[in-house]
């Protein structure tokens, strides 16, 4: 016998609701390729570029929107899962080299399932990001997490984003998602 349930009448309305606000748990900067990542308490997000002090944010951009991988984000709740799948201790945020670690807000749900409904991620009082895609793990995860480390991170490697509005980021900032008032600008950037 089927369970009575209210029908879903407006999936778009459901996709606009989040149960709670998240929190920025860590800010990680990667000064240069091959250099150790560093955790900081605050940094500046620069529209169309990335984070000040990070190798992607310090690069000059030719497109006004910049590339699609200006900032990388990781779900804090995925850290213990990655460790469990790899059979290792929980890795530090700096080891995984993702710029922003967020807890309490499902980052995957902050990507709209509808092409004509853009969702923006707000961090603190100023910064606005647009999530642009998955941040797949690289082969360095094998060395970090051991054999199978790459596969331990698959599906949990985080997301990439572009900075739409500049501002100061601080560990502890509130993070929330909302549907944009108008669609985000489109780009034909191929470097992304």
Which functions belong to the PLM regions below?
Residues 1-192:
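Metal-cofactor-dependent catalytic cores
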């Amino acid at each position: 016998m089927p369970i009575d349930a209210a029908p879903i009448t407006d999936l778009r309305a459901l996709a606009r609701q989040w149960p709670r606000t998240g929190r920025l748990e860590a800010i990680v900067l990667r000064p240069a390729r091959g250099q150790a990542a560093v955790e900081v308490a605050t940094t500046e997000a620069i529209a169309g570029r990335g984070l000040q002090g990070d190798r992607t944010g310090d690069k000059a951009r030719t497109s006004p929107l910049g590339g699609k991988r200006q900032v990388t984000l990781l779900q804090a709740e995925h850290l213990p899962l990655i460790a469990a799948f790899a059979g290792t201790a929980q890795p530090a945020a700096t080891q995984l080299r993702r710029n922003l670690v967020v807890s309490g807000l499902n980052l995957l749900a902050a990507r709209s399932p509808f092409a004509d409904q853009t969702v923006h991620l707000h961090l603190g009082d100023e910064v606005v990001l647009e999530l642009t895609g998955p941040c797949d793990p690289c082969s360095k995860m094998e060395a970090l997490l051991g054999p199978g480390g790459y596969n331990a991170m698959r599906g949990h490697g985080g997301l990439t984003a572009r900075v739409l509005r500049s501002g100061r980021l601080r560990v502890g900032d509130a993070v929330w998602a909302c549907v944009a008032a108008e669609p985000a600008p489109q780009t034909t950037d191929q470097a992304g």
